[in-house]
């Protein structure tokens, strides 16, 4: 008995560390399948011994919150759901009742409160007893109504999620994410719990309602389906659901399973709830689970295979990720041959060695993972040098998680941002080269400097092996790269990523030197500060860049691949030279404000984002607007002109008074 209780304590300690890492620190020290296995083993021991320890995860819902967001206790505790992987259990649980079967979205659960038709509060699930107030962040969710027709007090629950497509895009673009966000759920958690909701708004968070908690004086016929449809009519997106009975639940589960891969949103199973609200509520709850709902987790398809290699993939943060390469197997209809191991702690826990027989599966039927190591031959060697720069590596340990890092600050993998910037839309415009793809190309040693990007066609076979790139995508990429060979001095200058030299300043510099690249790269400090809009700091940064011998070689290698367009520019065309403009409000004669900005810059002017004492004109079609820019312009006695006045100036030379 004592041995079994000690075993329970050991399992609880491991589960507690894993849950803390996942929910508080947005990292993983074990896979979901390992966690579930340990948890089920603990439940069996508790059942066998009749002992449940006070710190067991079987009776605890969450963890203490560790952020600076305001906290608030929930009016009703938010319990987790009991779960099963057996459809027969679902059928038995439902019995003769009708039910609602819906997606179990894998994001962050949120409680929303509306009063008088307005969103007044949004709180995360948190510990289940207490959550974090994220009202300002919820206001910038992509699809959340901040005003609704219903004027009573409304409380509903739902899931904030980030779609797979946005996850891939955002994870490639956001520098501070690095390897921290392993999946859409972790990215969503970090996005929803921001102190600055500008960050939240840029992350494309969506909300899907799944439960109505309170709606005063609304008659919904004691029906969950009616509740969901009523929420939909109020403007909320709700989780897809189907009404089921014990006779059709098996085929309905099958329908959901067949539609997983078509979904752009993360899901980790299904939720079955009694359609009869009163009946469900009459059942009450256990200390941890409500009795009116149950979760269904997909039974993972596990295939045995042989571990062939562990590939170490460096990232822009210096972190070097271990990736398992194994004999290809068919999983959920696709061929899989690699899976992320995430960190050294997981690698040690699995005792992975080359040649081991391992079990692999797709987490949530999407992401390849290692479930177990059947032979456990011992740890494969951890590299002492970075695979990209051959510099020294070191193992770091934080919150009980071991990770491998390259300590060389000059490592090419850490310069990923310069490559990302170089291929960007306003620079070389090489469509198809995402940050993730560039990171893989660098990690494999296929590109070592910017000019190498123009010759990646010779690595076709290696590139086609990268996830997400097929023959068609590769051909489009090569076409885009070849198209980029013919470019402008402005694009080239901007693409070099010189500190403090943005696109508009690159245009000013190129225009000043008549687009002559030889004059541009050999510009003197005294010349640069003569250009309106170029100050001492920017000029110093420019001179420092072109004085660096290594940078000169990089630029020359790029130039050897390019054909710079000649620009013929007459002085008479520069009608906006040395003038500063600000654009606000909607435009009517141009496609958008960017098109208007381009016209101004082509004619020698500069467009800024804020009204200051240096602003000459504010372009605004609504002169009576109460916008901050309008007010500021009037305070500073700056001319406010309409598009029509601007066009009269542009086309007929009539400058507004």
Curated annotation (Swiss-Prot):
Catalytic activity reported: NAD(+) + (deoxyribonucleotide)n-3'-hydroxyl + 5'-phospho-(deoxyribonucleotide)m = (deoxyribonucleotide)n+m + AMP + beta-nicotinamide D-nucleotide
InterPro entries, per the entry: BRCT_dom, BRCT_dom_sf, DisA/LigA_HHH, DNA_ligase, DNAligase_adenylation, DNAligase_N, Hlx-hairpin-Hlx_DNA-bd_motif, NA-bd_OB-fold
Transmembrane feature ranges: none
Assigned keywords, A-Z: DNA damage, DNA repair, DNA replication, Ligase, Magnesium, Manganese, Metal-binding, NAD, Zinc
Binding residues for NAD(+): 80-81, 125, 159, 297
GO BP field: DNA repair; DNA replication
Cofactor(s) it depends on: Mg(2+); Mn(2+)
Residue intervals of the BRCT domain: 571-657
Residues given in the record as Zn(2+) binding sites: 386, 389, 406, 411
EC number: 6.5.1.2
Residues the record marks as active site: 104
Molecular-function GO terms, alphabetical: DNA binding; DNA ligase (NAD+) activity; metal ion binding
Functional summary from the UniProt entry: DNA ligase that catalyzes the formation of phosphodiester linkages between 5'-phosphoryl and 3'-hydroxyl groups in double-stranded DNA using NAD as a coenzyme and as the energy source for the reaction. It is essential for DNA replication and repair of damaged DNA.
Family that this chain belongs to: Belongs to the NAD-dependent DNA ligase family. LigA subfamily.
Protein name as it appears in the record: DNA ligase
Native species: Ruminiclostridium cellulolyticum (strain ATCC 35319 / DSM 5812 / JCM 6584 / H10)
